[in-house]
Amino acid sequence: MSVKAYLELIRVHNVVGSAVSAFMGYVIATTWKFTPLFFLPLLVVSLIAAGGYVINDVYDIEVDKINKPERPLPSGRIAVNIARRFSIVLFAVGLIISIPLGLIPFGFALITIVLLYEYARSLKKLGLVGNFIVALTSALSAYYGGLASGSLLGNFIIPTIYIFFFTLSREFVKGIEDIEGDKRNGVNTLAVKLGEKSTWIIAKIILGILIFTSPLPYFLGFNVIYLIGILALDVLLVYILILHNTIESATKARSLMKIYAIGTLIVFTLGSLRI
């Protein structure tokens, strides 16, 4: 058994990002007050996210044999039946760990598992529906951290909404990048439906709204670290807005959006400190 192969399979860097997102939601909701169980929502989110990545690779194996033959499943480093069982274990452990957090967090964990499974099994091919599910489950990582602290609503809703729309725009950009492969595989993305230029316009409108509204959290309780950080990060989005509406630009934009996503988690987290 290769540990490296399993870390690749769960996309460990993405899982860490999900955990950081949950941590952000938690510290915003509690104003950095920790209970002995503060780590549980981080574990729940990490395990369920990992399970989602694994089951996604299970259903994507035929496509990955062509597009990503080096991945653990198509390369044969991990057997498909083993990966399927591994995803079940990850989902089950994540769900069990959510029980001490209460009925509502348990329910959210269960719903997220169902969404991730159905996305991998069939909803991904619906394109726009799949984009919304990816955006929703990404945003739920932040929301879950706040929810697990005992709050249904609070300032943690702000980054949750922000993450949803940012991820949605990133999914549209990814659809532009993957348009040829999606056409061949019958994935009905927005880019396949409308074409790359129209999809670029929609993605840029969303990013433009995010830039315009990005200072608002400062006036809703986040500190000056947030304001300075988000305005600096907005430069990346402005650069994306001036890129040409092409497939090549989508590849460049996606790389910049990864940097922006990490930076946003940091500035929202530090921006919740009471200074």
Curated annotation (Swiss-Prot):
Cite a GO CC annotation: plasma membrane
Q: Which GO terms describe its biological process?
A: glycerophospholipid biosynthetic process
- Give the E.C. number(s): 2.5.1.42
As for subcellular location, the record says: Cell membrane
Q: Does the keyword Magnesium apply?
A: yes
Q: How does it sit in the membrane?
A: Multi-pass membrane protein
The record describes the protein's role as: Prenyltransferase that catalyzes the transfer of the geranylgeranyl moiety of geranylgeranyl diphosphate (GGPP) to the C2 hydroxyl of (S)-3-O-geranylgeranylglyceryl phosphate (GGGP). This reaction is the second ether-bond-formation step in the biosynthesis of archaeal membrane lipids.
Protein name per Swiss-Prot or TrEMBL: Digeranylgeranylglyceryl phosphate synthase
